[in-house]
């Protein structure tokens, strides 16, 4: 076991703070409509220009091990917010930085960190409840376009493109983002389907940047039950290899031997393949697998129809022009099913809906019909250079996640104003002790930070604008940093998804609470250059 270096108390918190400060300063410059870009060095190729907080955070590694731990803890805020909401990473980082900064001041004054933590939790619960009360449904295409544009760094063309895509495939429809071949981004709608099942092994990933498996001109094996016989599967794999097509396996489950065979073939480059579990449960799973079969022109492997795995041939497989599989979902584009068969299947589902006894069954049948009829919207992102294309694709992806969140939980005024209005509920709130009340005040002060930073990045004076916005009784009144004008932010189209704002706040508070209750740090000790180097630089502890 390698020797360890330990630091405690103020020395540990000082190191954490320096790491947090370094990462936060790099991320904060991207916030708001007038936020700046960051240039990232890459191991290969030209530098990457980004305006995404999570990408900036992921790129930072500090030389000092203890400071780097602080930076990585703050990076976790951005990563978790990105994973859960797809947007709001910079706001979460700014909030966490503000809470940690205020909290460390209180700790330096001798306050109890556990009481501070309880005060933070009480304040966050109160503010979240107020945000949910403030949220309004995202009802119109115009509101969706505004949400998307703001998330895409105030790019109206991206907002309009996403609003158009949602109009065409519905709010639950599948939207896929691809590289375009021209200078202008375009929207296409193709026959396709998306369901919420991802790959069974990360070894299937062949697109590292998007953490997905992409299979072009793919054959699709559909199994109603479990895939348990490796010997029956091998002849089919040989046929698929000869045909030169990738293979997507959709089954109730795949046993370890069969999964291992697919993974090994993928890693060796013998066959591009991927395996996913079939969507749904019980009888609904059977019906959904049959939906996929109709869409792709395949035949389901099922004892009920007398087709076993050993009898399956290439012509029994479904086909699609493209399949994209992530950790959480599978998207099939351009299925080879006959249009009349698809229309007949949709008609059958709608008849079943008329006979359904419960709202839940009707809802699920509506979803199935929508997946078959709505298709998949393809946004082909255009740009002049590869560097611009990557940056623009990231903005489109952020905008898509933001619109999904807005549809799910509604919208609130943007520009940091929603947090400023929600903090009014903290004015009369007190904790059980003085230190708990200080935790509440800590959160109240941190809720100003997103607005302050947006204004600062726009080149204006934060305190002046903060005071004017805070004094207004109108809950939607705020400052539009893009136009440098005051007014009703909802009418001006400066809106944020309530879900993104909520998750940014909750994740920021979670990490801030953990950091404020930390009293010791342990890291692998560097090799000492001499006997005197055996003590750590703080002089707080020898190596163990």
Swiss-Prot record:
ATP binds at residues 30-33, 87-91, 415, 480-482, 496. HAMAP family: CH60. Forms a cylinder of 14 subunits composed of two heptameric rings stacked back-to-back. Interacts with the co-chaperonin GroES. The keyword Transmembrane does not apply. It is an enzyme of class 5 (isomerase). InterPro entries: Chaperonin_Cpn60_CS, Cpn60/GroEL, Cpn60/GroEL/TCP-1, GroEL-like_apical_dom_sf, GROEL-like_equatorial_sf, TCP-1-like_intermed_sf. Disulfide bonds: none annotated. The keyword Nucleotide-binding applies. Its EC number is 5.6.1.7. GO terms for cellular component: cytoplasm. It comes from the Bacteria. It is found in: Cytoplasm. CDD domains: GroEL. GO terms for molecular function: ATP binding; ATP-dependent protein folding chaperone; isomerase activity; unfolded protein binding. PROSITE patterns: CHAPERONINS_CPN60. Pfam families: Cpn60_TCP1 (PF00118). Together with its co-chaperonin GroES, plays an essential role in assisting protein folding. The GroEL-GroES system forms a nano-cage that allows encapsulation of the non-native substrate proteins and provides a physical environment optimized to promote and accelerate protein folding. This is Chaperonin GroEL 1. It catalyses: ATP + H2O + a folded polypeptide = ADP + phosphate + an unfolded polypeptide. GO terms for biological process: protein refolding.
